[in-house]
Regions:
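Mature extracellular/secreted ectodomains of secretory-pathway proteins
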Residues: 1-99
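Low-complexity, repeat-rich tail regions
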Residues: 60-202
């Protein structure tokens, strides 16, 4: 439903999008995704994948997060993960956490401009290699209408997400708080009163 709404309202952004979201009964996480319609469209087109990913994250969050780092490392080793005008790629040291054994450092990917996100489009077999997936989980290559054959990793137009993405992933301290929440941005987009002074909260 949200994906169809987004397709019908492609020009709504910023404050206008915030206002429109107040009329919809969706979960705040769904409302936030309307700022990145390309991601929302892929999740809608591949509902079985979206459900499986959600269930896997609920049951095995550490395994999912480790898998992300393994794939980023593979892309980096193949020369397919680099900083550019859309994103910054850097490594951060991990904070030791009781009861959790993770890698000593993490690969972090951040937008060059904090309020804008460029959603990457790529063939996972090309970026990660032809043997990275288990036989039971053959990868798929989802691409938007504008996609044409070009660089290994392509990017669409910038999506303004300043007020909509209120979560920040804390890779360096996963054992204690994987996700931090910016209460001011959450409150602004969802018109609710959450204390916290506008800072990222654990």
């Amino acid at each position: 439903m949200a994906a169809r709404w987004s397709e019908k309202n492609p020009d709504l952004k910023g404050a206008a999008l915030e206002d429109a979201m107040q009329k919809e009964p969706w979960d705040p996480s769904v409302k936030g995704l309307t700022s990145v319609p390309q991601v929302l469209a892929m999740m809608s087109d591949k509902l079985d994948w979206t459900q499986q990913l959600g269930e896997a994250f609920l049951a095995q969050p550490d395994d999912i997060q480790n898998a992300i780092q393994v794939l980023r490392a593979r892309a980096d080793e193949a020369g397919n993960l680099k900083s550019n005008k859309e994103q910054n790629v850097r490594r951060v040291a991990a904070t030791p956490s009781p009861g959790y054994a993770g890698p000593p450092e993490y690969i972090v990917i951040e937008p060059v401009e904090p309020d804008y996100v460029y959603v990457p489009v790529y063939d996972p077999v090309v970026v990660y290699g032809a043997d990275y997936w288990p036989p039971a989980y053959v990868p798929f290559f989802w691409y938007p209408r504008w996609w044409t054959v070009g660089p290994v990793i392509g990017f669409g137009a910038a999506a303004f997400v300043g007020p909509a993405l209120w979560y920040h992933y804390n890779w360096g301290n996963r054992g204690y708080a994987a996700v931090q929440t910016n209460t001011a941005l959450y409150s602004r987009f969802n018109r609710v009163n959450v204390t916290g002074g506008g800072q990222f909260q654990n």
